[in-house]
Amino acid sequence: CHGRLLDLMGQGHVILDAIEITVIDEADHMADMGFLPMVRRVLDKTPGQGQRMLFSATLDAGVDVLVKRFLHSPVVHEADSSAPVGEMEHHLLGVSAAERGDVLAELAAAPGRTILFTRTKHGAKKLTKQLIGRGIPAVELHGNLNQNARTRNLDAFHHGLVETLVATDIAARGIHVDDVALVVHADPPAEHKAYLHRSGRTARAGQSGTVITLVTPDQRHEVAALMRAAKI
């Protein structure tokens, strides 16, 4: 990670003077997490004449700072810009706190691949355990898992051995699994870009998909603002 790299640079163990190609992935996510100052410090130590590639789901203000400062005469490539866009249906489902577990279990048991998103690692682990306890095969994906467990669970989901994946936002970034029929926001995300990233796991490559957000009474105003920001 960039923090560890900066530590090694500060100790004199790593020198970036001879770097010819620099790749910045998930730039928008690093901006959201407040990591851009560290990224800039790393880039400042690479040769200005080298090749730099930046990958981002969005090009908003935070990412644009990197573009203007470090990319000279940049060329923009939009992945799948001409690909057919599938139909994505968005639904809000009002539930009480007492009903939430039963509703999530019913959604997870529906035919087809389903991804349920939670805000926290603990929430993902707890929900996975609850689903398995109800006889619904499910795997979890979050930051508390080691790499072997992450790979094993994702492979099981990818190959159809398990059709329900419970994930956190950060762990699920970069997941590319086709034919996800349903995305469930078990916990509404904190901001609209996370909502769009989560929802984008379905309706890919011309396929249709459904997105359901569970809303408890105390979340109504928060979710209404979220939908407006996401232009849903």
PLM features per residue range, with description:
Residues 1-232:
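Conserved helicase RecA-like core
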